[in-house]
C-alpha cells in the first residue's frame, strides 16, 4: 500500500484482508487462463514406486494421475508425506498448548476497521477480521483448559451471536514433519506443519 508521509494531517486507515475462498477462486481462474489443467478429484490412494517415491495418485472416479513431483496439500492428514512415505512428525504440544479453534463468521459491519483484532480470552485468544461481505471470527484455545462447548459459548458471547450461525471446531496438530521434502513429494502448508500464529 501507499507509504504514509509524516506530514499527513490524519492517520492513514487502511489494511488488506483476503477472503481465502475468493482468493482460491481467483488463483484457479488466473492459472487456468494460462493453461493449467484444473480438475476437482478426490485422491483415495497413493501408488508408490520406489520406497521413497510416489508413482501416482488414484482417485475415487478411477482416474490415475502420474507425475514427477507431488505436492502434499492434504492438510493435517498429510496423506502423502506422513501416511504414505512415513515422514516423522515432531509434536510441539508440550510447549505450545493451543490445539483447537472454533470459527464463526458474523455479518459485515458498517464500522469498517482496517486491522484484524486479536483479543485475549480465558484459554487462548480470538481474532476478528473484517472482510467485504462478512467478519471472520475465531477463538484459538487449549483443549486442556476449556471444552469445545465452553469455548464456543465464550466466542458467541464475545461477538454477540448467542443463537445465530453454525460454529465449526477445528482440531490442530501443532508441530512439523522432520523433512519437508521426501523423495518426489514436497509437503506444503498444514501437511508439513503448523504453529498457532500468536504462539
Language model feature labels by segment:
Residues 1:
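Dinucleotide-binding Rossmann-like beta1-alpha1 core, especially the glycine-rich loop
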Residues 132, 141-199:
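FAD/FMN-dependent oxidoreductases across multiple families
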Amino acid at each position: 500500500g501507499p507509504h504514509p508521509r509524516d506530514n499527513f494531517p490524519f492517520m492513514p486507515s487502511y489494511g488488506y484482508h483476503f477472503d481465502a475462498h475468493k482468493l482460491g477462486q481467483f488463483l484457479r481462474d488466473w492459472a487456468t487462463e494460462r493453461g493449467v489443467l484444473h480438475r476437482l478429484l478426490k485422491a483415495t490412494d497413493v501408488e508408490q514406486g520406489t520406497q521413497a517415491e510416489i508413482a501416482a495418485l488414484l482417485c475415487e472416479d478411477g482416474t490415475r494421475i502420474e507425475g514427477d513431483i507431488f505436492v502434499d496439500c492434504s492438510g493435517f492428514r498429510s496423506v502423502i508425506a506422513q501416511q504414505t512415505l512415513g515422514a516423522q512428525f515432531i509434536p510441539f504440544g508440550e510447549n505450545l498448548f493451543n490445539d483447537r479453534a472454533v470459527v464463526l463468521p458474523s455479518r459485515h459491519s458498517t464500522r469498517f476497521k482496517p486491522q484484524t483484532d486479536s483479543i485475549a480470552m480465558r484459554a487462548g485468544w480470538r481474532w476478528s477480521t473484517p472482510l467485504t461481505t462478512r467478519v471472520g471470527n475465531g477463538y484459538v484455545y487449549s483443549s486442556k483448559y476449556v471444552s469445545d462447548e465452553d469455548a464456543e459459548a465464550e466466542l458467541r458471547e464475545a461477538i454477540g451471536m448467542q443463537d445465530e450461525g453454525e460454529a465449526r471446531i477445528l482440531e490442530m496438530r501443532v508441530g512439523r514433519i522432520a523433512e519437508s521434502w521426501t523423495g518426489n513429494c514436497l509437503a506444503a502448508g498444514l501437511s508439513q506443519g503448523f504453529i498457532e500464529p500468536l504462539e
